[in-house]
């Protein structure tokens, strides 16, 4: 997955809202969202059929997990307009998501992620959140856990440490190539989401869907900007030739009133495919949270 937008505890009545675009090689096989059996309960997640596991999911305790692949550190020999290519021989990052979905809370998931084996995976960022807490794991050879405050968080394929939402008061990443298209995308998307969340008269899902469809440089039906430096990967909806691009998009809203929770998804790029209402899957998952759910999870894990 390449663009992950999370609004955590900043929308009244909706403690967790997610928008996510998955960019991947078009030939890589996958299944769409479905309810599946995890090791400690049920989960709602798509499935990667090439390596197993998944790139995002929600469990029946209300823990959301989403992973984005990280590019190598900016170097002269790294193509800023190319896809993220994994080193062979390392363990699948999809199994990290599946393991995190076994947790009873975001805090529990983050504690387990902090114990990940050193050097076992290609680089990634993984965000876990429930209705109370959110954590970001940045993994480059070893895990680093960041506590996220309430607000808007946008995660992509670069470790954007200038994100004041994620690292308040820290001025990191100044040596990063600010012209990198993925860095520009994170800044643009963050600004757009902040504006949309303040528009009380607009449906939040419709606004997020519009962002997920966007192309930069005047290409496509939802085009923004006209920079000559725009590239495929500055767009939220990516079309990088015949082999790589946005494969699917997902919108998730967990409301305090569970009957008002929503799930929309596309099978294909959202600029070409309409969002389908997948909310019945979310209702069938029957998300539970709070002390009762934690007690049930503890009972399950002791069996």
Description of each model-found segment:
Residues 1-303:
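N-terminal nucleophile
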């Amino acid at each position: 997955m390449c663009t992950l937008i999370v609004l955590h505890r900043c929308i009244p009545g909706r403690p967790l809202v997610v928008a996510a675009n998955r960019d991947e090689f078009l030939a890589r096989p996958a299944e769409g969202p479905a309810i599946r059996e995890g090791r400690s309960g049920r989960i709602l997640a798509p499935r990667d059929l090439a390596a197993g596991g998944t790139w995002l999911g929600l469990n029946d305790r209300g823990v959301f997990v989403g992973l984005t692949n990280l590019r190598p550190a900016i170097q002269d020999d790294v193509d800023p307009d190319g896809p993220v290519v994994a080193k062979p021989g390392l363990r699948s990052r999809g199994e990290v998501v599946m393991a995190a979905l076994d947790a009873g809370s975001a805090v529990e998931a983050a504690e387990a992620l902090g114990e990940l084996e050193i050097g076992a995976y290609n680089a990634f960022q993984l965000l876990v959140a429930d209705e109370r807490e959110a954590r970001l794991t940045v993994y480059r050879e070893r895990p680093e856990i960041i506590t996220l405050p309430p607000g808007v968080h946008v995660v992509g394929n670069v470790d954007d440490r200038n994100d004041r939402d994620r690292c308040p008061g820290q001025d990191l990443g100044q040596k990063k190539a600010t012209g990198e298209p993925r860095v520009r995308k994170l800044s643009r998307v963050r600004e757009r989401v902040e504006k949309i969340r303040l528009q009380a008269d607009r449906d939040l899902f419709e606004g997020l869907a519009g962002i997920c469809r966007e192309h930069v440089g005047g290409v496509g039906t939802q085009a923004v900007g006209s920079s000559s430096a725009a590239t495929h990967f500055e767009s939220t909806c990516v079309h990088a030739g015949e082999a790589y691009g946005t494969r699917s998009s997902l919108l998730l809203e967990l409301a305090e009133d569970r009957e008002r929770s929503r799930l929309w998804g596309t099978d294909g790029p959202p600029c070409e495919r309409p969002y389908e209402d997948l909310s019945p899957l979310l209702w069938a998952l029957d998300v539970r949270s709070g002390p009762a759910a934690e007690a049930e999870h503890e009972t399950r894990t002791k069996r």
